[in-house]
């Protein structure tokens, strides 16, 4: 039996990187957290803190590169920006640890209401995942684990 010949458009789609064939989705959600920014921040920015609620394991490598391990698979990211006790952003890299155009990123921002003193965690997940319901459920579960750790 002969191998089917793919139309040119299908062949091009197979050869293009995934980032060139998909559009990214920006998902944002906020959670009230009963913990001070000073207590919460290390759980968002340090490998040991992240490993307690966010993924299986986190290793800090050279040049502020993080190796996030989910299901025994490595996902590399750079700490792109941070403000102590305020925010942290991880920009994901390819498997060779190189920057990518339109890369996935994850942004955690801690906000405190001056009026009520309530602390909020804003999660911004910019990725290929487009199912808002699935993302909401995933982040609800992860942040619930985080709340249990920080007592809030």
Regions found by a protein language model. Name each.
Residues 40-41, 50, 79, 90, ...:
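Hydrophobic pocket/interface hotspot
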């Amino acid at each position: 039996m002969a191998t089917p010949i793919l139309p040119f458009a299908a062949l091009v789609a197979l050869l293009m990187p995934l980032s060139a064939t998909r559009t990214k989705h920006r998902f944002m959600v906020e959670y009230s957290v009963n913990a001070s920014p000073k207590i919460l921040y290390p759980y968002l920015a340090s490998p040991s803190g992240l490993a307690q609620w966010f993924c299986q394991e986190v290793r800090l490598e050279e040049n502020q590169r993080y190796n996030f391990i989910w299901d025994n698979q490595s996902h590399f990211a750079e700490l792109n920006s941070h403000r102590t006790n305020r925010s942290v952003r991880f920009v994901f890299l390819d498997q060779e640890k190189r920057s990518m155009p339109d890369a996935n990123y994850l942004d955690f921002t801690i906000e405190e209401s001056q009026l009520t003193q309530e602390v909020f965690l804003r999660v911004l997940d910019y990725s290929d995942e487009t199912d808002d319901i699935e993302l909401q459920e995933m982040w609800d579960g992860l942040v619930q684990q985080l709340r249990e750790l920080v007592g809030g």
